[in-house]
Amino acid sequence: MTTDFLFPKIADCSYVSCYCEENVWKLCEQVKRTRPEELSKCYAVFVSNEGRTVPLWRQKAGRGDDQVVIWDYHVFFMHNPSPNRCLVFDLDTTLPFPTYFHKYVTETFRSDLALRPEHHRFFRVIPADTYLIEFSSDRRHMRRPDGSWIKPPPSYPPILSNTNLHCLGDFICMSAGKGPGAVYSLSEFVHNFYKSPHVMAQNNK
């Protein structure tokens, strides 16, 4: 794997456990600041479903040999610099940082075929520049009814847009007609962002 990465070391990235949406926003911000020419090739990807019960494997918070966990949603960063090259940067995975798209999807999501329909994963893919402008969260989802924190928040102020105080739900929602970006099933997601070497060879003939 080439070493020309947007984020050479995971230690260089802003990270707070259980705030994946903000961690990815910070990655987008870092690209805009240090590699602005690459921003149009970057995406924030939300994973969820109607019941907000999505199984993911190879996660640091997972259990057992397969490191599986069920989240209400998850967010990762994706860099798609060319049709045959797509890298996933997930700050919560036990896979390498980054990981090639096909390996990441295969090991993290496996297949929907063995899962009940209520556990099928859907993906909202949002261009990084759009995410930087439209994402806004006052972190209310991380507070208990008494106002205490479920998990300690980042030390920096909440990320707030100019037009909205808290729109996280619009990003987690997997209804195609609501929220920014495009929504895909697992198979559609793979079809749109993975081109096998065999297909690329055929197209180049």
From Swiss-Prot:
What does the UniProt record say this protein does?
Mediates the side-chain deamidation of N-terminal glutamine residues to glutamate, an important step in N-end rule pathway of protein degradation. Conversion of the resulting N-terminal glutamine to glutamate renders the protein susceptible to arginylation, polyubiquitination and degradation as specified by the N-end rule. Does not act on substrates with internal or C-terminal glutamine and does not act on non-glutamine residues in any position.
- Summary of subunit composition and partner proteins: Monomer.
Q: What protein family is recorded?
A: Belongs to the NTAQ1 family.
Keyword Transferase assigned to the entry: answer is no
EC id: 3.5.1.122
* Record-linked Pfam families: Nt_Gln_amidase (PF09764)
GO molecular function terms attached to this record: protein-N-terminal asparagine amidohydrolase activity; protein-N-terminal glutamine amidohydrolase activity
State if Hydrolase is listed as a keyword.
yes
| Active site, renumbered | 20, 74, 90
Query: What InterPro entries does the entry give?
Result: N_Gln_amidohydro_ab_roll_sf, NTAQ1, Prot_N_Gln_amidohydro_ab_roll
**Record's catalysed reaction(s):** N-terminal L-glutaminyl-[protein] + H2O = N-terminal L-glutamyl-[protein] + NH4(+)
Q: Which PANTHER family match?
A: PROTEIN N-TERMINAL GLUTAMINE AMIDOHYDROLASE
List keywords of the entry alphabetically.
Answer: Hydrolase
Q: Which Gene3D superfamilies match?
A: Protein N-terminal glutamine amidohydrolase, alpha beta roll
Please state what the protein is called.
Protein N-terminal glutamine amidohydrolase
A cellular-component GO term for this protein: nucleus
